[in-house]
Amino acid sequence: MIYPKTYDVIVVGGGHAGTEAALAAARMGAQTLLLSHNIETLGQMSCNPSIGGIGKGHLVRELDALGGAMALATDKSGIQFRRLNASKGAAVRATRAQADRILYKAAIREMLENQENLDLFQQAVEDVTLDGERISGVITAMGVEFKARAVVLTAGTFLSGKIHIGLENYEGGRAGDPAAKSLGGRLRELKLPQGRLKTGTPPRIDGRTIDFSQLTEQPGDTPVPVMSVRGNADMHPRQVSCWITHTNTQTHDIIRSGFDRSPMFTGKIEGVGPRYCPSIEDKINRFADKDSHQIFLEPEGLTTHEYYPNGISTSLPFDIQIALVRSMKGLENAHILRPGYAIEYDYFDPRNLKASLETKTIAGLFFAGQINGTTGYEEAAAQGLLAGANAVQYVRGQDPLLLRREQAYLGVLVDDLITKGVNEPYRMFTSRAEYRLQLREDNADMRLTEDGYKIGLVSEAQWRMFNEKREAVEREIQRLKTTWYTPQKLAEGEQIRVFGQKLSREANLHDLLRRPNLDYAALMTLEGAMPSENLSAEVIEQVEIQVKYQGYIDRQNEEIDSRRDIETLKLPDGIDYGKVKGLSAEVQQKLNQHKPETVGQASRISGVTPAAVALLMVHLKRGFKDAK
């Protein structure tokens, strides 16, 4: 049957990408349908019970700046919060939280069920329908056809998923859930370029069988950090600690004894795994000289005894898993509640996507999350929001939301995917960005909220909060510039106490704050330095960073401006680069294969040289008339 209601946007999949995509589209006013094989697992944390971290936390803040759900759900479910790299530069400081799985899923479910313009339906999707070269809808397992003008696919690890434990394997999307075999086959029929990747998860441990007296405690931070600009510490549930143990030489010998039954080393697994989250057997094989690896025991929630041993993801046989777990200090009597496993799944080459995350071959079809070759909740959620928003923009015939590399880590992520592709699961690091100083956690709202508000992603309440913060920052910076001190105005002892030396000349608070040995709090102890208004910690942090890093930021802005013409210069559709004189055969082949949308994208394709970019610029100035 054909369902009687036609939707603007259909989202397939209810993981982190799918829920953000559906919420984004509905917030923008589009009639949206979210389809999942099981609505009880919407927003489920399939692997580790944590959100954020270096690079990933930056993505979460960017999501939040665009009205996304992940940061707020984390504030409602986080049972431990830590500020990473707090003593380092502002660019690499990041927030990480342990989340209660049940509370996190409940927070996401509550947002979904209370979001206007959003319908939920429980049914697996087995087919997509086309009208020529445009998407027109989907068909579910029981034959219901849902019509829509745009479809966002967020299938995670479910497309032709295969689970491995030792030499045993079976079809599955994750433990306890079926694979999306029919949909995977249908997408392959559409000639979309695809491959296989792999990820894994560790065995889960019953906390009642852990001897915590032998472990090192790792508490959260005090005061407790907050993830969302819409959140606060009062939202947080009870806070708990993580615990640290280590592998040892006995552990490593046990792991090596299972190599002959490991699907990784016997060729059973063909997919490539994540480089920066390797299995324990991969770590022992690659780093044979190391006698020990740190393992974090992370609580899964407040109402369960289950612990997640971060660092021993494995697909070794279950008997080896038991032995390796029990070889570690504090885990000698540990009971495993669930075995670790690896999962192989289909992904589709993201070089077949536009910067909007729409496929180049099927109009109105968008991909987000692990289907694009990424790994991680945060990477998936960020793509989901962007794909959901751009599906609405596509339906309305409006320009997509495109984020530049110097504007957002989400811009870096998408640009890396669509220009370079992936040969292993992609995860975000701050080192992937050229302009890290611009892309800090603390200024995500300053970078993105206005763009989100313009297209309807950001609520009026969040927009009002943002403007209040932005105006407070501007007022305080101006006040610092107009508050002056002379050597005569301050007692000599006061000068030495605050500045570490005597003032040699008149200076304002703005210039004094730029000194590396001074911070805002110390300056405010000067007589007459305190502002008349009460400033939030977020405003003070923003003021201090803007003032202290102003010189570096200005230099980066100059560099960005010098490249802006290259970055945004559009390449005409349908160009045959083989007819562009001066380009080598290799460059012609790669440009024709990748079909970049801008000169900036072309410049980041492997093998495209600066000389080739210069030739493209020359031809663009001439109009490309002869090259078409």
Swiss-Prot record:
What cofactors are annotated for this protein?
FAD
Q: Which GO terms describe its biological process?
A: tRNA methylation; tRNA wobble uridine modification
Q: What is its main location?
A: cytoplasm
Q: SMART domains in the record, alphabetically?
A: GIDA_assoc_3
Give the GO cellular component terms, alphabetically: cytosol
Q: Which UniProt keywords apply?
A: Cytoplasm, FAD, Flavoprotein, NAD, tRNA processing
Q: Which residues bind NAD(+)?
A: 273-287
Q: Which residues bind FAD?
A: 13-18
HAMAP family in the record: MnmG_GidA (MF_00129)
PANTHER family per the record? GLUCOSE INHIBITED DIVISION PROTEIN A, PROTEIN MTO1 HOMOLOG, MITOCHONDRIAL
| Subunit | Homodimer. Heterotetramer of two MnmE and two MnmG subunits.
Protein family according to the UniProt entry: Belongs to the MnmG family.
State what protein this is by name: tRNA uridine 5-carboxymethylaminomethyl modification enzyme MnmG
The source organism is Neisseria meningitidis serogroup B (strain ATCC BAA-335 / MC58)
